[in-house]
């Protein structure tokens, strides 16, 4: 996320959405009654033509929000409301409109009051955008899984199957290996141009990954500089996750916080397994610990963080963490650590002392 303009005296913040994680953050701060301005397409009815068949015309509108809808498995945020400002010639003031926000969208938010929590969320989102993403490749002589790791999630993007003949067919195998490597490299080039990853980590069993790295660095020296060697026991998505758990991509993943998320959740479960007094879970229990200043680190799953019904309690948690200098982390609910956290209610805390 990029904050393009900030004028809190007018209650105005203009920003640009850079990636999917930004959409999640945005969904947590836009509320009913906010004024949102952005460029959009609006179907305009022409004389004598059905309303649903008019021309879609680009325009800039301002709506007063009455509904925000986020599909956790979608890449779009839908913001609905009543049009308050728009081109006079179309006569659409007072009508409903829905903005569709995705990667690359720019919008202006005007609030009656920007809470400290809102600003903390924006600050965190902007900070995470600066850290970028990393591509991971788990490969062997049968196939390659390519995934993207961001600040909160790991997403499988492609699986490329090799068609290598038997090792007895030396000439045929060499030709097919070049084709296989070329397809992987072309896919990485396309992704590289789109997301500008901080690094590309390539892992897998045996020496096959080494041959690919040599090939890729020779064919594309610029992208080759971003490539690092990892280690995984297989070429599936579990191999990608294995690289993260083993710390193979740690030099970049520590920037993206994903490895820290895994470690933090594992520490919670280790304390729980020992019946330790230095851990608690559940929204109300954690909020009480935070208010007493006992919480050292608070973990909140995305499913809880972005639940409209939990907004007030979540904001109270974040404000309490700021006040008592406790660390808080948002854990992606679609990730392995997020699923584990959701299994115990989606909120947990490691404590500084017993309460």
From Swiss-Prot:
Gene3D superfamilies: 3.30.1330.30, eRF1 domain 2, Pelota, domain A. InterPro entries: eFR1_2_sf, eRF1_1_Pelota, eRF1_2, eRF1_3, Pelota/DOM34_N, Pelota_arc, Ribosomal_eL30-like_sf, Transl-rel_pelota. Coiled coil: none annotated. Its EC number is 3.1.-.-. The keyword Ribonucleoprotein does not apply. SUPFAM superfamilies: Dom34/Pelota N-terminal domain-like (SSF159065), L30e-like (SSF55315), Translational machinery components (SSF53137). It is an enzyme of class 3 (hydrolase). Its cofactor is a divalent metal cation. One of its GO terms (cellular component) is cytoplasm. GO terms for biological process: nonfunctional rRNA decay; nuclear-transcribed mRNA catabolic process, no-go decay; nuclear-transcribed mRNA catabolic process, non-stop decay; ribosome disassembly; RNA surveillance. It is found in: Cytoplasm. Keywords: Cytoplasm, Endonuclease, Hydrolase, Metal-binding, Nuclease. Transmembrane segments: none annotated. It comes from the Archaea. The N-terminal domain has the RNA-binding Sm fold. It harbors the endoribonuclease activity. May function in recognizing stalled ribosomes, interact with stem-loop structures in stalled mRNA molecules, and effect endonucleolytic cleavage of the mRNA. May play a role in the release non-functional ribosomes and degradation of damaged mRNAs. Has endoribonuclease activity. Monomer. This is Protein pelota homolog.
